Curated annotation (Swiss-Prot):
Pfam families: Pur_DNA_glyco (PF02245)
Keywords: DNA damage, DNA repair, Hydrolase
Family: Belongs to the DNA glycosylase MPG family.
EC identifiers of the protein: 3.2.2.-
Top EC class of this enzyme: hydrolase
Gene Ontology biological process terms in this record: base-excision repair
Organism: Burkholderia lata (strain ATCC 17760 / DSM 23089 / LMG 22485 / NCIMB 9086 / R18194 / 383)
PANTHER family xref list: DNA-3-METHYLADENINE GLYCOSYLASE (PTHR10429:SF0)
A molecular function GO annotation: alkylbase DNA N-glycosylase activity
Protein name per Swiss-Prot or TrEMBL: Putative 3-methyladenine DNA glycosylase
InterPro entries for this protein: Formyl_transferase-like_C_sf, MPG, MPG_sf
Residue intervals passing through the bilayer: none
């Protein structure tokens, strides 16, 4: 899905650009319980996220500056930054902060809400519903997100994806824990999840 596609439909308000035009570590926990919705009807509640803080974060793709691969992350806030990793998986981030800062939030897990048949068809046979979107690579596969979605405007009316506030508040009194799947920056407590949610990829060790 790209420009010209129908707008995603989900009850609630599409998050405005101002929501994303802030420090990634502020945006990330407030994305919990928001809805990632696709124009084809697939939708899931965001239950796990990680923040990446650009030039001050050795684990960020943008730590060493702008390249053709990470250029989207340096663009305006409120867009998807989709990248290929380990030669086999796509991961998706929301670009945050002012244009040029190279910061964003990795969406790590969704609780599937709608369009489960499409999600199941996109994932390997026999995948349990709990595992459809439990992890960053799984959720992109289930939601139909790949390289073609890099740069999609989440606020644009017809770019295929949006993040929607359906009135569900983020969990209260959240504490961050260390990010996972990285080798540097592991001391930074920039991973958050919905406590007790069975769709989270792994428990957050609070610090």
């Amino acid at each position: 899905m790209r420009r010209g596609d129908p707008a995603p439909r989900w009850p609630g308000a599409v998050l405005p650009r101002a929501f994303f035009d802030r420090v990634a570590t502020d945006v990330a926990p407030q994305l919990l319980n928001k809805i990632l919705a696709a124009a084809d009807g697939r939708a899931g509640r965001i239950v796990e996220v990680e923040a990446y803080a650009g030039a001050i974060d050795p684990a960020a793709h943008t730590y060493r500056g702008k390249t053709p691969r990470n250029a989207t992350m340096f663009g305006p806030p409120g867009h998807l930054y989709v990248y290929f990793t380990y030669g086999m998986h796509w991961c998706c981030n929301c670009v945050c902060g002012p244009d040029g800062t190279g910061t964003g939030v990795l969406i790590r897990a969704l609780e599937p809400l709608q369009g489960l048949e499409r999600m199941r068809a996109a994932r390997p046979p026999q995948t349990r519903d709990r595992d459809l979107c439990r992890g960053p690579a799984r959720l992109t596969q289930a939601m139909g997100i790949g390289g073609a979605q890099d740069g999609v405007d989440l606020i644009g009316a017809h770019e295929g994806f949006a993040i929607v506030d359906d009135g569900s508040a983020p969990p209260a009194d959240l504490a961050g824990g260390p990010r996972i799947g990285i080798r540097v920056g592991t001391d930074l407590p920039w991973r958050w999840s919905v406590p007790g949610n069975r769709y989270v990829s792994g428990p957050v060790t609070r610090r």
